[in-house]
Amino acid sequence: MTVQRILIVSGTHGNEINPVWAVKQFNREENSLKHGIEYEYIIGNPVAYEKGCRYIDVDLNRSFKESENCDQQKNSFYETNRANFLLDEFGIDGSKPCQIVIDLHTTTANMGTSIVLYGRRFKDFCLAALLQNKFGLPIYLHEKDKAQTGFLVEAWPCGLVIEIGAVAQNFYDPKIIDRFSLIISSLREEIDKLKNNLIELPKELVVYVHQGSIDYPRDKKGVIDGLIHPERINQDWKMIKKGDPLFLDSQGIVHKYDGDQLIWPVFIGEVAYKEKNIAMSYTKKEVICSKKQWVQDFESL
């Protein structure tokens, strides 16, 4: 295994402040160099973090698109410029190349501690399997959504998102901070074990594969005209079947799920997703058998 440097990003969204605190605290207590691997810690969007807002011009976590990161676009938006800086500094061809990136986020939804993967890269599966095997964390596999692209971790050869909630934006929660510290510490230990052939991957990986997103009920003017149904609030990862309630509109009408397939909702009522016209996303459950190729690809980094 030739991994030499791993990038830990917090504050990709400026109002998600708990991982920033956790990283600062962790970095004071732990050596950035561990078992031959150097760990780089950086605030993804420092200007937004100082202002306490999600972003300045556009979502940084949708700004890692090749077509938008070309030279003529560098000065268009702050986040586009910032994405280019991060790639120039820490990208695989950057001045301090990192082979792996871990992006730390919080959510206002009741997601607990979870992993988010983008696509089916074997290296990512290997990394996620280490954490799911240790903590039993649910994995949200986001793929094939043309409306949502340009995620930070996709710009590196290997990476994943750690998502923890529920917690309000710009609110420090010691329990959330402790969870981040535990995950960062454990991930470092698990990578070291894998590097020294001291750990085996689980036989299978359970993932929740993104299928789409559902908007709030809206009136003829496009204004939100319904709330998430009381039975659905805080029920992330809980199965939904045909006929189960999703929303309660202003007329008292219950909007029910009318699909034939079982689904599992995620990011229910996430505040930041209102602007994206998303009340919740939904997934299907899939079990993926582990492959030796996962470790081989990871070791090739």
Swiss-Prot record:
The protein's required cofactors: Zn(2+)
SUPFAM superfamilies, alphabetized: Zn-dependent exopeptidases
The UniProt record lists the keyword Protease: no
Any one annotated GO CC term: cytosol
Keywords, alphabetical: Hydrolase, Metal-binding, Zinc
InterPro entries named among the record's database cross-references: AspA/AstE_fam, Aspartoacylase, AstE_AspA_cat, Aste_AspA_hybrid_dom
Residue ranges of the TM segments: none
Cofactor: binding comment: Binds 1 zinc ion per subunit.
Family assignment from sequence similarity: Belongs to the AspA/AstE family. Aspartoacylase subfamily.
Protein name, entry field: Probable aspartoacylase
Organism whose genome encodes this protein: Prochlorococcus marinus (strain AS9601)
